[in-house]
Amino acid sequence: MYAIAEDTLPARVLKELLLYRRRYPEHRQSASEADEIRRIEQVQLPRIAAFIEAGEPIEFVLPAFPAKSPNPGKVLDSRPDMAERLSLSFLNHLCQRIQLFYAPGAKITVCSDGRVFGDLVRIGDAHISAYQDALRLMIEEIGATHIGVFNLEDVRAFEAQRDNHEQLRQLLIGGYAEPLESIRETLLASEEGLLLYRAITRFLYEDGLTPDYQGSKTALQRDAKERAYGVIQRSWAWGALLADQFPRAIRLSIHPQPADSLKFGIHMMPTRDDWLTPWHGVAVNTEDRFVLMKRSEVLELGGELVQINGQPSHYRLPARAARRAAVA
């Protein structure tokens, strides 16, 4: 067991992360949080300490920010908005807080994964490219100097196929993906695997409920269940590639993770849904803070659209509705 004093630099860094940890909601009552933290410490403290002992910036990677959901019941439109802006600002501020007590600081590489599974989530490559370009511009606009971006087309070994997005996906699958049957077996073998599979299935089902969808909900659900295996296969392949590209980096995740995982699940905005992300929701200005919600939920509460520079940005809730939407 890795033992480390509570007042050491690695422990202080981990405490910053723990403030925003994504936990499985199903585990909140059944698992001891103290026991979970002890298990997290055993995994993460030695990895954080390795950077500090070398006097280097602590390196994080975060597979995230693929593209906006195609469902207008969840998001404003296809462009990054206040939800992304606040999330990127949070990530940059997290690095700044670490730098207050550890001078070399930290850096986070956002590994945008839209290109990885865009065909499976039925978002076109042109939309993914536009989202990625807007995301880079947003990072510059907010002065997020601690954040970098890495995409599938940035992999040096794939450089010859940089403009052939389908071939890039095939190179990823061929080099890093496990067989689909193996993915199925792994997911069905644990509670965490089932939770992930159900969450991805739900995302795909909800994203498919667009105004122009003409099929039955049963057919869409069946299709989402099948595509979910492929999305997870690609996501895990992307993770394996990132482990090659950033072998020492601490892996952050937008999903809840087991306490003994190498991945650390992190919230970028307050939300009642531990699976909701900025690209599946909208930013909502309540009485005292911004929270993340689905657009349809905000509209039911009477949310008022706010535009910035002529573009839809976020929603504002009346005081009474804001109290109903309060996030614990």
UniProtKB/Swiss-Prot annotation:
<dbReference type="InterPro" id="IPR017133">
    <property type="entry name" value="PvcA"/>
</dbReference>
<keyword id="KW-0456">Lyase</keyword>
<dbReference type="InterPro" id="IPR007817">
    <property type="entry name" value="Isocyanide_synthase_DIT1"/>
</dbReference>
<protein>
    <recommendedName>
        <fullName>L-tyrosine isonitrile synthase</fullName>
        <ecNumber>4.1.99.24</ecNumber>
    </recommendedName>
</protein>
<comment type="subunit">
    <text>Monomer in solution.</text>
</comment>
<dbReference type="Pfam" id="PF05141">
    <property type="entry name" value="DIT1_PvcA"/>
</dbReference>
<comment type="similarity">
    <text>Belongs to the isocyanide synthase family.</text>
</comment>
<comment type="function">
    <text>Involved in the biosynthesis of paerucumarin, a cyclized isocyano derivative of tyrosine. Responsible for the synthesis of the isonitrile group on tyrosine using the C2 of ribulose 5-phosphate as the source of the carbon atom.</text>
</comment>
<dbReference type="GO" id="GO:0016829">
    <property type="term" value="F:lyase activity"/>
</dbReference>
